[in-house]
Regions:
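Phosphate-binding site recognition
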Residues: 1-221
Length: 221
């Protein structure tokens, strides 16, 4: 599952599967750390996700091969009759320089996961190029391994109209077009439209006031 940031990928997956996720992990953003420090932080975070899922671990793994071995140990303890659902969010962030993540993931998938008929792995990411190059168009160990591809796009203008109607936001079509040109079809942004204000007032308070919810959004992306 891939698409631009804020489009609703994580929301869609988590709300679809709800409490059926066997293992859920969100990668750390690579913006603040780098090199070996970032790799260790990612591995520690992966360990924390395993612990939250119920696995007892004494120390964090030192490589992605060790990390996926721990994941195999955890998943192997689940009943064969139970559907195992693994969700890795922002997977591209795990592939830090010289981390060996892709090679380790290939080994995990081809050496164990592909043989588990009850396993579903959902890989999600905002870095579209990475998803396409490393997963969808992979020519190595992950060649033709993806069974379902979903590119989540922003809402169309018609879908925006349906969204606003469902959420009690009254706008004529002229204002809907104006709103679409301002914030697009991104559900996250659309959720901030307050039906108690006019479109102009909403845009002003969200984008142009000092503490507006979307004033600094461009820089964050």
């Amino acid at each position: 599952v891939y698409g631009r940031r804020r489009v609703g990928k994580t929301f869609l997956i988590r709300n679809y599967f709800k409490d059926r996720l066997t293992f859920y992990h969100t990668a750390l953003s690579p913006l603040e750390l780098e090199g070996g420090e970032l790799l260790q932080a990612q591995l520690q975070n992966f360990t924390s996700s395993l612990r939250r899922s119920g696995m007892e671990i004494d120390a964090a793994p030192q490589s992605w091969f060790e990390a996926f071995d721990l994941l195999i140990d955890f998943l192997s303890g689940k009943p064969k009759t139970e559907k195992i659902i693994v969700f890795i969010d922002e997977m591209p962030w795990l592939d830090t320089p010289k981390s060996g993540f892709v090679t380790a993931f290939e080994h995990f998938w081809n050496g164990w996961a592909a043989g588990q008929d009850n396993l579903l792995l959902v890989a999600c990411g905002s870095a579209t190029t990475w998803i396409v190059d490393r997963l969808l168009s992979n020519k190595g160990g992950l060649y033709n391994r993806v069974t379902q591809e979903m590119h989540l796009a922003p809402f169309t203008l018609k879908e925006c109209e349906e969204y606003y109607r469902e959420h009690g936001v009254v706008m004529d079509r002229y204002d809907q077009v104006q709103c679409y040109m301002a914030i697009g079809g991104i559900p996250y942004y659309m959720s901030f439209i307050d039906p108690g204000y006019s479109l102009a007032q909403n845009i002003d308070r969200l984008l142009f006031t000092r503490n507006g919810l979307l004033t600094l959004e461009f820089g964050r992306l």
